[in-house]
Regions:
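A generic structural signal for short hydrophobic patches within well-formed alpha-helices
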Residues: 30, 120-121, 227
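Polybasic "coupling" helices that flank or enter modular domains
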Residues: 107, 125-193, 209
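Cyclic-nucleotide recognition modules
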Residues: 79-139, 143
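Long cytosolic regulatory regions associated with cyclic-nucleotide signaling
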Residues: 1-12, 92, 141, 160, ...
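Cyclic nucleotide-binding regulatory module and flanking cytosolic helices
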Residues: 1-44, 93-94
């Protein structure tokens, strides 16, 4: 769980104010969000939420990087998605009031915004713009999960790395992500299920094809369209 929590309304207003869905709310709904939500600092490798727990919050990554995954008793994991800054997740489980179906772990030290389920449901019923935003989220997330399963089962390692990176640049789910992403080879390994050494070889191959450039704990994308289709032709 989180190490610290921020409830200061002025700070929360600054954080929530950068998101389009919040900007589109009426003033009363904005006050409800600020008055009931919090920001949580989550350290590297810490758990924000666990599978099987009640889905009592809708989450947004203000900065850092989270992964959504399932772990078994031996520690093996299956990663569904990484969530970079600007990404919101968990709306499906909150709407259905079901227990969370995946674990949420911080790959990087992260600042996460938490909106209570009751507030989320109020916004759904009172704000047409918010309802449209959530529907878009659900559609995009479903496509992302299907692609993740396809990638893990059908793609070779180089293509898995490329597609895991490409998912972090979905403009509808992650509008805050620019073409320079702060992520290390080890962190990308957490998302792909590959070793750091294998990720390194894949990134070198992508760099040789001028799709990206590597720097220390940073990757700059040179050709996003090529990254998105890399390795998909055999499918």
């Amino acid at each position: 769980m989180s190490d610290t929590a921020i409830h200061n309304e002025k700070k929360l207003l600054e954080m929530f104010g950068v998101y389009s869905w919040f900007q589109a709310l009426h003033e009363d709904d904005r006050r409800l969000v600020i008055g009931t939500s919090r920001a949580e600092s989550v350290s590297h490798d810490a758990w924000l939420a666990r599978r099987g727990e009640p889905s009592d919050h809708w989450f947004g990554v203000h900065n850092g990087l989270l992964k959504l995954a399932i772990y078994d008793e031996s520690g093996k994991s299956c990663t569904f998605s990484g969530v970079p800054p600007g990404g919101w997740f968990g709306e499906g489980s909150v709407i259905k009031r079901e227990r969370r179906k995946y674990d949420v772990v911080a790959i990087q030290p992260s600042l996460v915004l938490s909106v209570p389920a009751e507030t989320f449901e109020t916004l759904l019923s009172s704000s047409l713009s918010f309802s449209h935003f959530v529907i878009g989220q659900l559609n995009e997330r479903m496509g992302e999960f299907i692609a993740s399963i396809q990638n893990q089962r059908l793609l070779r390692a180089d293509a898995r790395v490329a597609q895991s990176l490409a998912q972090l640049f979905n403009p509808k789910l992650y509008p805050s992500t620019d073409l320079a992403l702060d992520i290390s080879q080890e962190e990308l390994g957490y998302l792909t299920g590959l070793s750091r050494q294998r990720v390194n070889r894949a990134l070198q191959a992508l760099q040789q094809q001028e799709i990206l450039i590597q720097a220390y704990s940073k990757i700059r994308i040179l050709d996003l369209e090529q990254l998105r289709v890399y390795g998909l032709s055999p499918i």
